[in-house]
């Protein structure tokens, strides 16, 4: 009987340890910005520990930076690229056209998107094996090397 109580106590302690570790990582965000060639880009990463769970990109592009003169010309130019983002589970993309600029919002939910679909996304770059998740630390290094600056909270 004592052996059963010891076994139960050990099992209980192990379960509690696993639960504490699982609950230990809280979700956080980091935001980075870059202005280059008439495009203002804002990247927001949502992550737990070192694992990125979601990335949102907001790109504001003046029509002049796209080499077009009007909203209609911008729509024609960007439609083919925008169409490539549609219908992928874990990915949302939309473009809002204003009088003098287009605002693209792209959201990648890494808990839903497959690594195969992720590799198909135009303009998406990564280092290493993405099937095991996306590292926040490695993502920060990569985008900072491209000129992005972290926004202080």
Regions found by a protein language model. Give the residues of each.
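Subset-of-secretome marker
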Residues: 25-153
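Bacterial N-terminal signal peptides that target proteins for export
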Residues: 1-11
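C-terminal motif of bacterial Sec signal peptides marking the signal peptidase cleavage site
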Residues: 19-22
């Amino acid at each position: 009987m004592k052996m059963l109580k010891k076994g139960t106590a050990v099992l209980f302690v192990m379960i509690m340890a696993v639960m504490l570790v699982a609950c230990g990582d809280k979700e956080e965000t980091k935001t980075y910005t870059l202005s280059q060639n008439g495009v203002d880009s804002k990247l927001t990463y949502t992550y737990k520990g070192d694992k990125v769970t979601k990335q949102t990109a907001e790109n504001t592009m003046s029509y002049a930076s796209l080499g077009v003169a009007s909203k209609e010309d911008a729509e024609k130019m960007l439609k083919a690229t925008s169409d490539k983002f549609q219908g992928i589970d874990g990915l949302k993309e939309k473009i809002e056209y204003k009088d003098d600029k287009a605002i693209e919002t792209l959201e990648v939910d890494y808990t839903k998107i497959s690594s195969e679909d992720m590799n198909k996304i135009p303009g998406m770059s990564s280092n290493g094996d993405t099937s095991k998740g996306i590292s926040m630390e490695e993502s920060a290094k990569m985008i900072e090397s491209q000129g992005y600056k972290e926004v202080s909270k």
